[in-house]
């Protein structure tokens, strides 16, 4: 991946907003992912999900971790080893969900940045989200 391009762009991302929207959209677009978040309260409608404080908080947490990955593109497995263990061994999250969230994140970035999110940037971010998803799914292999 083009590290300079990725980190330069990532520095403009509002992690709390983008994280909240990405996780919220994941839960709305792929409703079966909600089963991991039943303790978050009302997820009955799109508005309920996107307005849910726990979804927003966890979305920020997810993107804070993703930011760590952006800083360590050469060692995604190492960066996400503990989170992989938590999500795979303890929470039994289907690794496909990591790929879905990555794709939703790309959609949200395109929405927030419009023309600035060029096809070249999209190509780079698809590589990054695929790498992160693979690192998170590492415990399944």
From Swiss-Prot:
One cellular component term from this protein's GO annotations in UniProt: blood microparticle
Tissue distribution of the protein: Red blood cells.
Domain Globin: 1-141
Annotated protein name in UniProt: Hemoglobin subunit beta-C
GO biological-process terms attached to the record: hydrogen peroxide catabolic process
Stated family: Belongs to the globin family.
The protein's assembly and partners: Heterotetramer of two alpha chains and two beta chains.
Reported function: Involved in oxygen transport from the lung to the various peripheral tissues.
GO molecular function: haptoglobin binding; heme binding; hemoglobin alpha binding; metal ion binding; organic acid binding; oxygen binding; oxygen carrier activity; peroxidase activity
Coiled-coil intervals: none
Further comment found in the protein's record: This type of beta-C chain is found in these animals when anemia has been experimentally produced.
InterPro entries cross-referenced by the UniProt entry: Globin, Globin-like_sf, Globin/Proto, Hemoglobin_b, Hemoglobin_oxygen_transport
Alphabetical list of Pfam families matching this protein: Globin (PF00042)
Gene3D superfamilies the record matches: Globins
Residues that bind heme b: 58, 87
Domain of life according to the entry: Eukaryota
Keywords assigned: Heme, Iron, Metal-binding, Oxygen transport, Transport
